[in-house]
C-alpha cells in the first residue's frame, strides 16, 4: 500500500504543518509514503514531496496510493479541497467547522477583490457574482433546505456565529472512504451530521520536551518573580482573551503581582493592546508575537497557570493544549464538551457561565493552591506520555489506513465547479 499525504508542510506557519511532518516520519517506517503540498518543498523531509497538482499524473503508477487529506479551518488547506472531493481517501479533520475558510477563499478570490476595488464596473461585478455563486452552490449542496439563505447572510454579513451552526464539512465527509478525528466528541458530532460515515478516532501524537525549571525559564526569558498567566496561540477573541483581561484586572485589584503573557501572533480584527489600555492594565500585559518552538517551551515553563479558554470551538483538538500538558504545565480550559476527553486530574476547568468573576475565582483558587498545581503538572505529563506519544498516533493511523484500503469509494453528487 502506497500512502499519499496532502498537507501544508513546514515552513508553512500552521500547527498542521508540524503535525504532518511528524506523521510522515512515523508512516514512512510502515508504508511507502509521499507528500503533496502547495508551498515551498522542504528539502529536509525524509520522504518524497511533490507539488499537489502532480498527484493525478503520479496516480497512474501502480499500486495506486491511498490519499490522506489533512484539512483544517484555514486558507493553508484550500489546495486540498477539490482533489479530496475527486479522489476518495482518508480525510483527517483538524477542525469540524470549515465554513470560515471556505467563505474566506471566495471573498478573497481575485474576482471579488477586483470588484470591491472598482464597484462601479459592471463587468467586474458579474465576475464576482459568478464566483460567489460557486460558494452558494456549495452551501446549498450541504444544506438543501436552508443553504440559499445561509449563503446570502454569510456573503452580506460575514457569517459570524452562524458559520459554527453550518460547519460545511458534509461534502468532504461524504465523498471520502473514512474520516479521522482526534476526539470522541468530534466523532459523535460527525456521526450526527453525516450518519453512516466511517469515522475513527486517532490519538494526536505530541513530542514531549525536556523539562526546564520555572526559575531557569524565567531567567532565560528575562522575566522576574511575578505570578505569570499565559495564553498560547493566535490571539483571537475566540480564546476568551477579553474575559482573561478583565480577570487580570480583578487580580491586580486584589493585590496579586501578576503579568499576563500572550504567546502568539495577532490578527487585524482584534486589538488586544487597545483593550488592555482601555482597562488600565496595559503595563501588565505582554505580547510576544509568533515565537520559535524553543521559546514556546520556555514561556510554558515560566508560567504559573496556562490559559486555554477557546470558545466557541470549531471542533478541534488543540495541539497547543496537548503541548502545554506535555510540558507538565497547570492548564485551565473552558469547561465544555471537548474537555470531557481529558481526565479530570490532568487539567483545571473554568466555567463557561458568567463573566470575568467566574474565571477570576477559578484562577485565584488555583494560585492559592500550589499543591494542586503540582498534582496537575505531574498528571498532565503522565497523561500525554501514555495517550499522546507519537508511537500511538503512528499505530492508530496504520490500523485505519489498512481498514480504509478495503472500503469502496463513495459517489456523491457535487456542484458543477467541484466535479
What is the meaning of each model-derived region?
Residues 210-223:
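A short helix/loop element that forms part of the nucleotide-sugar donor recognition site in Leloir-type
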